[in-house]
């Protein structure tokens, strides 16, 4: 079944619910009358709700309408491409060196236009110290404030604590000429206080 918009003589129904060029509701009229009104206004009769009974048609400039629809579709695709979510996983007792490394990855992701989900992973008795996670997330949010903002505040998620950071508008454009892709930094990063993934001491 074709989804192409029907215009003018391609609208083959006996009557339509007509909307005028200014958005005014004209009412149900014969198709011949609707076509005549559109022609007198040097505009097009466009079927905007074909599944209604009777179909809804609007008098408009169809060329301009097609252009606006295409613009909205492009904007929608652009927005979808910008909703990539990266993830950084940290332990609540992270040392300063590893924190700076992870922070730099978060900054790069934000500059690239990606959102970042930051997850604090608690183990064992660490679960009784949620304030450690809150402090770490608050610190990170403040440290990257020039590159993004806290979209979803810190919250407990089972044994973990999460926060979502979003880039400032235009971040990807500003950063494209300054930074290449982060070498070796994937979508998920997991470190503990020593920089090891298993929590064992050096």
Swiss-Prot record:
It holds the Pfam family IF3_C. One of its GO terms (cellular component) is cytosol. GO terms for biological process: ribosome disassembly. InterPro entries: T_IF-3_C_sf (IPR036788), T_IF-3_N_sf (IPR036787), Translation_initiation_fac3_CS (IPR019813), Translation_initiation_fac_3 (IPR001288), Translation_initiation_fac_3_C (IPR019815), Translation_initiation_fac_3_N (IPR019814). It is found in: Cytoplasm. IF-3 binds to the 30S ribosomal subunit and shifts the equilibrium between 70S ribosomes and their 50S and 30S subunits in favor of the free subunits, thus enhancing the availability of 30S subunits on which protein synthesis initiation begins. Monomer. PANTHER family: TRANSLATION INITIATION FACTOR IF-3, TRANSLATION INITIATION FACTOR IF-3, MITOCHONDRIAL. NCBIfam families: infC. This is Translation initiation factor IF-3. It comes from Mycobacterium leprae (strain TN).
